[in-house]
Amino acid sequence: MQPLKRIPSIANFKKLIILTAMCCSSFFYSNTYAENSTLAAVPQVELSQYLGLWYEVARKPMYFQKECAQDVTARYTVNEYGNIAVDNRCTDMDGNILRSLGEGFVVNEPFNSKLKVSFLPESVRWMPVGRGDYWILKIDSAYQMVLVGEPKRKYLWLLSRDPHPDEAKVTEYLRYAQRVGFNLKDLIRTKQTE
């Protein structure tokens, strides 16, 4: 004869449902809070250290990068107007190098952590239209890795001075992005062949 099995009581089911609801609501609340909270840029960026070549490690989908298959880089220099010249490059599926030139305008001097970037033709870049937010959200003290995003959390880039950075550091930066409200379900990891 088999021993009788204990049937959970209604009270235990209610407790389980309440506990599950509390856990789910706290998870939902924390994610919603992060997504709706104000996004903060780093306190200050030393532009002279930020300039130079960066390799893209990962990104959220961006319409102007839809043809980029690998080897995405960004080079930042100071242009003749004292703004940031942006030279983005990538390789498409056919092996062609694609290039996009733009200009970044610092909007929070002297802190230099928030820019507006335009990829409009050079002759009309002076107009304050067609400029996207480019906020530096996290950067290490040696300026070797940077997380860049924008306040609506639709776009995000993880850049590194090394085409193949330490995976633990990559994970650290991506976890930070999640903590401040970025949904990384559509994150694209960039292939670098260098």
Predicted regions and their residues:
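A beta-rich soluble binding module of mature secreted/lumenal proteins
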Residues: 3, 26-194
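Bacterial N-terminal signal peptides that target proteins for export
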Residues: 3-17
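Bacterial N-terminal signal peptides
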Residues: 17-27
